Amino acid sequence: MSAKVVLDFEKPLFELEAKLHEMRECLRNTTRDQSPADADLLYGDIEALERKVELLRRSIYKNLTRWQKVQLARHPERPYSLDYIYMMTTGFVELAGDRHFSDDKAIIGGFARLEDEAAGFSQSVMMIGHQKGRDTKTNLYRNFGMAQPEGYRKALRLMKLAEKFRKPIITLIDTPGAFPGIEAEERGQAEAIARNLMEMAQLTVPVICVIIGEGASGGAIGLGVGNRILMAENSWYSVISPESCSSILWRSWNFKEQAAEALQPTAEDLLAQGIVDRIVPEPLGGAHTDPDAMGATLKAMLIEELQQLLPKEPQLLVRERIEKFSAMGVWNEV
């Protein structure tokens, strides 16, 4: 069994939880000849420590810095695209290949059914997302979630297929960036991403994009042009990672916390700036602490958005999408 991953700011909480676990084990192993008073005293200590743990947990996770949210977005136990697909949909059929070069395992996609009997909703959708690995072997297989040009071309092929059959598209974004290797550049990485932006803007079906973890630069925006942009509470979305920004501005990664503050990459920041439309709330401590609850929350929000988008005419969807992205950013005319 792999060891629990504890982030640096979580260590005080982890230490208290470990102490609480020890006390519970001590109570469980209490022998019959111990006095009731001793057991009552231990019960009282446990209850007091439980309250302290809960207060500390809320204090930590309700006051996260931007850099701490970046760390949570990268948590190795966090749900990935395939996890969400299997939690939210049924009948997922993965489709492979870009029909030009190869099948990029860093991007997955295929048709699935999104349904909620209580809401009276059932809809076939195209699910597309970045996919990371859980260990060294699967991370190498998935290229750490960094897509090659063929990955973006595969995604576009699936989007055009969904458009042909009039199915809405849902993209799940979670990448440290597009793969920066020489071979990716030789095969047209920039062109592949740019073409996705152009083509996604003109799709005549509803497109919903969800940042579920990391949303780094062109690697993220290559799947990020939609009618609705949703963002998980503890995810980040920016033109550059805090570490890379730090290395460029200060010639060192030691200023990543300051870079994160300057970049303002969190869901709250981007909602205020009008970049994203809704924040997907996470369980206290992050999506990985209760993946099922996180999946249910996201599923409900996706159904809400689709119920609003599906009745719209194709040309209205295109016009609203283009207007949405045209309004982003700040510039001066001279």
Swiss-Prot record:
Its signal peptide is none
Q: In which pathway does it act?
A: Lipid metabolism; malonyl-CoA biosynthesis; malonyl-CoA from acetyl-CoA: step 1/1
Catalytic activity reads: N(6)-carboxybiotinyl-L-lysyl-[protein] + acetyl-CoA = N(6)-biotinyl-L-lysyl-[protein] + malonyl-CoA
Cellular component GO terms held in the UniProt record:
acetyl-CoA carboxylase complex
- Chain ranges of the CoA carboxyltransferase C-terminal domain: 48-308
Which keywords does this chain's UniProt record carry? Answer: ATP-binding, Cytoplasm, Fatty acid biosynthesis, Fatty acid metabolism, Lipid biosynthesis, Lipid metabolism, Nucleotide-binding, Transferase
Broadest EC class? transferase
Task: Tell me where in or outside the cell this protein is found.
Answer: Cytoplasm
What GO molecular function terms would the record report? Answer: acetyl-CoA carboxylase activity; ATP binding; carboxyl- or carbamoyltransferase activity
Q: What is its EC number?
A: 2.1.3.15
Which BP terms does GO give this entry?
fatty acid biosynthetic process; malonyl-CoA biosynthetic process
Similarity comment = Belongs to the AccA family.
Subunit note: Acetyl-CoA carboxylase is a heterohexamer composed of biotin carboxyl carrier protein (AccB), biotin carboxylase (AccC) and two subunits each of ACCase subunit alpha (AccA) and ACCase subunit beta (AccD).
What role does this protein play?
Component of the acetyl coenzyme A carboxylase (ACC) complex. First, biotin carboxylase catalyzes the carboxylation of biotin on its carrier protein (BCCP) and then the CO(2) group is transferred by the carboxyltransferase to acetyl-CoA to form malonyl-CoA.
List the HAMAP family: AcetylCoA_CT_alpha
Q: Tell me what this protein is called.
A: Acetyl-coenzyme A carboxylase carboxyl transferase subunit alpha
**Which species is listed as the source?**
Chlorobium chlorochromatii (strain CaD3)
The uppermost taxa in this organism's lineage are: Bacteria, Pseudomonadati, Chlorobiota, Chlorobiia, Chlorobiales
